[in-house]
UniProtKB/Swiss-Prot annotation:
<keyword id="KW-0732">Signal</keyword>
<feature type="glycosylation site" description="N-linked (GlcNAc...) asparagine">
    <location>
        <position position="91"/>
    </location>
</feature>
<feature type="glycosylation site" description="N-linked (GlcNAc...) asparagine">
    <location>
        <position position="361"/>
    </location>
</feature>
<keyword id="KW-0821">Trypanosomiasis</keyword>
<dbReference type="InterPro" id="IPR025932">
    <property type="entry name" value="Trypano_VSG_B_N_dom"/>
</dbReference>
<protein>
    <recommendedName>
        <fullName>Variant surface glycoprotein YnAT 1.3</fullName>
    </recommendedName>
</protein>
<keyword id="KW-0336">GPI-anchor</keyword>
<keyword id="KW-0449">Lipoprotein</keyword>
<feature type="lipid moiety-binding region" description="GPI-anchor amidated asparagine">
    <location>
        <position position="379"/>
    </location>
</feature>
<keyword id="KW-0325">Glycoprotein</keyword>
<dbReference type="Pfam" id="PF13206">
    <property type="entry name" value="VSG_B"/>
</dbReference>
<dbReference type="GO" id="GO:0098552">
    <property type="term" value="C:side of membrane"/>
</dbReference>
<feature type="signal peptide">
    <location>
        <begin position="1"/>
        <end position="22"/>
    </location>
</feature>
<feature type="glycosylation site" description="N-linked (GlcNAc...) asparagine">
    <location>
        <position position="379"/>
    </location>
</feature>
<dbReference type="GO" id="GO:0005886">
    <property type="term" value="C:plasma membrane"/>
</dbReference>
<keyword id="KW-1003">Cell membrane</keyword>
<keyword id="KW-0472">Membrane</keyword>
Length: 413
């Protein structure tokens, strides 16, 4: 049996070991997850904000657009003798008026056709706006990741990481007085993730973000042997494998921004030692009074320093791109709502055209409908185009009058 002294020593050792493990786990894991969230949103947007995806969101609910369906009604009206098939229902036909009443009915349908065409043109314009805003949001998200404009996200991201090759880490991971050649903090998510997660040596802080990042190389403070592009590949793989459920929506991105901003200064110790020096640190530091974020020790900081030339937060370019993406997504959503509203208006015009045919049938005494198979209805794919005439609006049919003729597709409106 162990004596009390040895037992206490073992317990104490286990406590210290557990504390060490916890410290290793918590250091920059939350910060990595926060920035990784924006990267994963961007990767999802690469597939979800394409032209095909935006088109699928604005297709006609009933398949064929109302203009085409009204054209078919006009074609059948002109080519049928006394009965016409209504809509796409094979067993529904109605009797047609003859002579002048038939011509007046045709002119009514042409007025509805003109209205449908105008409304559908507005639909097409709004659909184009949806696609444009999708492309804009996608481009902003990709530039947030890479700090560069370009069609290939992963190639641009690797190039952004390679730009850190041989750069002094203590300078590159600061934003104060940012210049293209030396200061990279805040310019891209790639740069900030490198500052948070790249090991400084093969043995120092190699699990700082919760995964081993040094297998493909290290990023020393002097910038030598950094292999930045390979380290980024390791970080990107870890991000892709991180179980984070993301959405490409304004609401989700706003929440992600709030979480990111809540981490600023969260791990900067001794904030009172030098005013507000550690308030804008992202990542781990034991000494906010003289932070270098050079990765050489926990005291110096394995972090990103967003402090500007004064104690205020400096510019974070990638965050600006995320906010621009939010605006683009909000405009996309507004245009989606406009598309759907206009589509409902166009479909209502189609219903009015069909109601005009029903009204004509009722005016003839509401003859019983007969199966279409008993009526020869020519099928023309080239409807005659005519100039629209100015006519009076069709009279609205009372609900009581059309109740016996409830059409299956009207239940979809």
């Amino acid at each position: 049996m162990l004596d009390n002294s040895r037992a206490r020593s073992i317990v104490h050792l286990l406590i210290l070991l557990k504390a060490h493990v916890i410290t290793q786990i918590i250091k920059n894991t939350q910060e990595f997850t926060s920035l990784c969230t924006f990267v994963k949103v961007t990767l999802k947007a690469t597939d979800g904000l394409t032209s095909a995806a935006s088109k699928s969101q604005t297709d006609w609910a009933l398949g064929e657009n109302p203009t085409s369906r009204i054209k078919k009604l006009i074609t059948e009206l002109e080519t049928s003798s006394d009965r016409i098939r209504l809509g796409e229902e094979p067993n529904l036909t109605i009797q047609l008026p003859q002579g002048d009443p038939k011509q007046r009915l045709r002119r009514k349908l042409e007025v509805f056709l003109a209205r449908a065409k105008y409304t559908e043109e507005l639909v097409r314009q709004a659909q184009g706006d949806v696609g444009g805003r999708c492309n804009e949001a996608k481009a902003e998200l990709e530039e947030a990741v890479t700090g560069r404009k370009g069609p290939d996200l992963e190639t641009q991201a690797t190039a952004a990481a390679a730009a850190l090759h041989n750069k002094a880490r203590g300078t590159a991971c600061k934003v104060a007085g940012a210049t293209t050649d030396t200061n990279f903090a805040g310019t891209s998510l790639v740069a900030d993730l490198m500052c948070l997660c790249a090991a400084e040596t093969n043995s120092r802080e190699k699990h700082i973000c919760g995964f081993e990042s040094h297998a493909s190389g290290v990023w020393a403070n002097a910038g030598t042997n950094s292999n930045a592009g390979e380290i980024w590949g390791k970080i990107l793989d870890a991000c892709k494998n991180r179980e984070i459920q993301v959405e490409v929506t304004p609401q989700f991105l706003r929440i992600a921004i709030t979480k990111f901003e809540g981490l600023l200064g969260a791990q900067a110790h001794k904030l009172t030692s030098n005013g507000n020096a550690g308030a804008w640190l992202l990542g781990y530091s034991m000494n906010a009074g003289s932070v270098t974020c050079d990765g050489q020790s926990s005291t110096n900081g394995i972090c990103v320093d967003y402090k500007g030339s004064s104690d205020a937060r400096g510019p974070i370019a990638w965050l600006g791109h995320i906010k621009n993406a939010i605006t683009a997504l909000e405009n996309r959503d507004k245009n989606l709502q406009r598309v759907r509203k206009l589509q409902r208006q166009a479909e209502a015009i189609l219903m009015s055209a069909e109601d005009a045919l029903i009204e004509a049938n009722i005016s003839l005494g509401g003859k019983d409908m007969v199966p279409a198979s008993e009526v020869t209805v020519p099928n023309s794919s080239n409807p005659t185009s005519r100039q629209n005439s100015v006519v009076q609006e069709p009279t609205t049919v009372s609900a009581a009058a059309i109740t016996p003729l409830i059409l299956p597709w009207t239940l979809l409106i």
